[in-house]
Amino acid sequence: LAGIAGAGAIAAAVVLLPVVLLCVQAFVPPFDALMISTGSEPLRLLPIPFSAEQWQMLFNQSTYWQAFWNSLIWTVGACVVQVMVAFLGGYVLAKYPARWCVAIAGLYTLMMLMPPQMTLLPIYRVAYANKLLNHPMLLYAPIAFAPFGTFFMRQWLLRWPDELTEYLRLEGGSSVKLLWYCLAPYSLPGMLALFALTFTEGWNQVEQPLMLVSDSLRQPLSALLKDLSAGNPQIVFAASVASILPIALVMLAVLVQQGSKRKAA
């Protein structure tokens, strides 16, 4: 076990090393960051001299805040819709004794095998025909109704005992009460995990914004990161860290919630 733990620690260090180095470069002076980004100077192992000027320059740009709020509002909205749709759809596919539920679950599985890039052209043609290009909804509606969430929640709810459902119904519990008071608390860890995964997918979109949204005022932060760095290459490291910080905070919040729940149990 000690050997496995040591190997896991080494693997984690290798994975986290690029992120740590990126964070270190985000706190060097802008001129030094420019030299590092062009390869004129090597990466710093420590932020010496320490400087927060990159962050000041980044936060003083209105373009950054516009893209940030575009990403945050639409991504959170898509995550909320995805969790609700996945929870209800997963309940139907997991607990309704009908053959068509099994067929639909199989169809969801097949749809999950399709890469997102395959749907870009159909979405573009539909949006162009209906004059919906440049609307952020094009980016986040496919995420809000993605088949993965329903499949994920179906697998989660399959573990709920059918006998317990029958007992609750015999006690006079309706489907609404069963969902709200029993299945929702039971599925909360799964819904939080799905929220975090959906947030990561929505926040990190690159191909979809470049193809479907040409208006820079409506593009998310992930698409404008290159333009921000090109106009001000001295803030490239701070902009990169700022783009991954919301994902890290969401993941950390989910882990803290799960840890506190285990301690309470």
Question: Predicted segments — roles?
Answer:
Residues 4-265:
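A structural signal for multi-pass alpha-helical bundles of membrane permease subunits
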